From Swiss-Prot:
Function: One of the primary rRNA binding proteins. Required for association of the 30S and 50S subunits to form the 70S ribosome, for tRNA binding and peptide bond formation. It has been suggested to have peptidyltransferase activity; this is somewhat controversial. Makes several contacts with the 16S rRNA in the 70S ribosome.
Record's keyword terms, sorted: Ribonucleoprotein, Ribosomal protein, RNA-binding, rRNA-binding
Record organism: Nocardia farcinica (strain IFM 10152)
Recorded family membership: Belongs to the universal ribosomal protein uL2 family.
Compositional bias per record (Basic residues), positions renumbered to this chain: 45-57, 269-278
Annotated GO MF terms: rRNA binding; structural constituent of ribosome; transferase activity
Complexes and interactors: Part of the 50S ribosomal subunit. Forms a bridge to the 30S subunit in the 70S ribosome.
Protein name in UniProt: Large ribosomal subunit protein uL2
Top-level taxon of origin: Bacteria
Amino acid sequence: MAIRKYKPTTPGRRGSSVSDFAEITRSTPEKSLLRPLTKSGGRNAHGRITTRHRGGGHKRAYRVIDFRRLDKDGIPAKVAHIEYDPNRTANIALLHYVDGEKRYILAPKGVTQGTPIESGPTADIKPGNNLPLRNIPTGTTIHNVELRPGGGAKLARAAGMSIQLLGKEGPYATLRMPSGEIRRVDVRCRATVGEVGNAEQSNINWGKAGRMRWKGRRPTVRGVVMNPVDHPHGGGEGKTSGGRHPVSPWGQPEGRTRKPNRPSDKLIVRRRKTGKKR
């Protein structure tokens, strides 16, 4: 993937860029793997906003991605197409299995049209192949990693993400996460070899607010320009600074967004590095 920069022909084009989609081989998705996707606008089942700054955007269809690949052990497949997916930053690869079934997976870096793909404990250590952690050599770069055996991949699924397998001891494998956190995961969990493709996606300059609205992203308003009824930093005469340490609209101090005392915390060997010492 390469980034194409626009010339400043209009204010919205100035500084903006777009992917050249050179890796994409087909523009229409596989119909049998599409599902309807209803927009929530950031609301839950009670109609209350649970995620701010969401709403609008272009209509999308959900592409069903195979995050398990457990039932395809020993069945060879070949990459038929690399496609764009509007629901994620990574591209997706359409696999044609020899038994006739078609499935989508996240497109790893280096996997192109015609690349053979396989799953299972005896699969080769090549990008796109899916194996249990116990069968992957130490030091290998992996992505699409499960947290629980058979639970489906949860870690390193965004464009350009990868995890390094540091070692294996007893029933656990030690992984270095993209954030720098080091944690242990059951060796029966499965992972895909290689890193997620489309890494240049993070270098795209969106250029104007309208392109973010197409993606369903609404404006993020600063608390200091709100009224006191809307935010703890609101109000004041003129451009005031807020007069207190940064907080959320509900008064919670900024940072520390991780939920404390999660059951899986006992498997964390070393925490990620944060910007501030607390």
